[in-house]
């Protein structure tokens, strides 16, 4: 499975933001080793800009971090698995797999 660089960055923030102990930090790092992290290139940046612009014009602005996640998924043709369906609902041509 793959994750966006932005998802990886958000996951790396959790331990500091939530005062995790060393055991939880270690478990997260081990778990993240199961995923390939996809990093942006010029095409990702172009897709990101289009997503941000289209969402803004449609009256549904998207957070920059969410646009990075969506642009990575769209570029690689990956479904976006998320518990935050609403954050991505206005993004066109994106397969969203909601989790609960």
What do these predicted regions represent?
Residues 1-75, 79, 89-91, 95-100:
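PIN-domain endoribonuclease scaffold, especially VapC-family toxins
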Residues 83:
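Conserved acidic donor-binding loop of glycosyltransferase catalytic domains
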């Amino acid at each position: 499975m793959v994750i966006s660089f932005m998802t990886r960055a958000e996951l790396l923030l959790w331990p500091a933001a939530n005062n995790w102990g060393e055991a939880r930090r270690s478990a997260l790092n081990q778990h993240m080793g199961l995923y390939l992290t996809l990093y942006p290139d010029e095409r990702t940046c172009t897709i990101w800009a289009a997503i941000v612009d289209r969402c803004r014009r449609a009256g549904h602005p998207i957070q920059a971090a969410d646009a990075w996640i969506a642009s990575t998924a769209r570029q690689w043709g990956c479904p976006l698995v998320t518990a935050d369906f609403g954050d991505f609902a206005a993004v066109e041509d994106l397969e969203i797999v909601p989790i609960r």
